[in-house]
């Protein structure tokens, strides 16, 4: 009888109570792990002591990688963009293959703490190191802006607090375990966060797939017939709903082939150049473990990425059927809750009391933010309250795990690459650790500002970070590993040209700087969107690097010998600091 009463009580608990319970449990777990695994040395702080197993590192890498963009925003983009959203899937997944095959083992062989550390030593120049630090900070701050917006989204809706308060709570949590634990604390915390986020993403997907198609496997349900409409496939139904409202067919793309190619390439090579992902491969003992870690991470990432298109289609179908042409007075409770956050807005333009959701902007009365689709999906499908709260806990795990990794990159770039290697080479290990933690505190404050004043929806902000990584780091790393003739003059010039052109394009065509109004798509260079321009900047980086290299002296022989050695990825280089 006691058990039955407990079950009934659990069913009757509101979403907010469930959210407090699940978020409270998971946050306690993260903080407990951070205290247990806190860093005692700079090696612990930067690379977790360099002795993490491939399985643990693979799980931590997957959590580090699957940010708020993957958990919250990717399915939201696919939900609204349909086939066009597939570029994010292709780019981000393909990037991991590139990273595992081309970069991870060689970077581990080189044996450094950070990407700017590799740049500085490979190109025998503190100027190159400084440019690397600036690029790492630009990439990381752009990326972390998306994570803090994700944190604010979840808190503002599910804990029903002000979005600014939500960001502050997230800042305090991530500050505690990132600053105290360093890479060692973050690694084990991220293993727990991966388990939370993948469970939170898959449970509602399985529920809704079974509810809509009778098939509990979302990847199969995505291509199945609807349970309540025999002989009608889910995607056919969604195509029909979309065209009825004046949108393009869900399964048809509208982006130009050039833009699709550019975005996919920018995301792929941007993945391979992300400082917070690369640094994870410095935490394992051996070169072969770096490749194993990448393989394990890729498998764990694919679980979520192969489910995202199904979640997007389920959410889009349910949203249209629930809201389109329905009286505003009878909208479900979840709609009103999201409306208070400002992420759903309804304006009754023709005063008929019905929600007109159509492609024509002049007639459309409903605006839905891309980023709420995954979070609202269980509510739209009327799943149990504990499932809705579980998604909130998963979204926070995704955002905070990546934010922690990014904050570590920022603090390491400042304390290790800037202070230790350039400003004060004689600094003690104790003072370097203090500098790293102070840098993380400052970085959290700046990240919080970006969370309160976000530059765009989560996945777009993150895609811009990938563009910056593609434009700056990827050519310098690839040429540094595979071309021993590559010298400091070429690398420095290439990185500067790449990052400056990408920044200019991003500021002009994404944020509207340099113009009174945001330029239209017709003004994009070669028809390439800001999210895809990283591929153009990357090519410019390669061209400038190789051209300048041809006109300047070759690197010292000892540097060329190091390049020869790291191309044989056996054993492991000793991490130096």
Question: Regions from the language model: what does each represent?
Answer:
Residues 2-577:
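Membrane-embedded helix-loop-helix hairpins and adjacent transmembrane boundary segments
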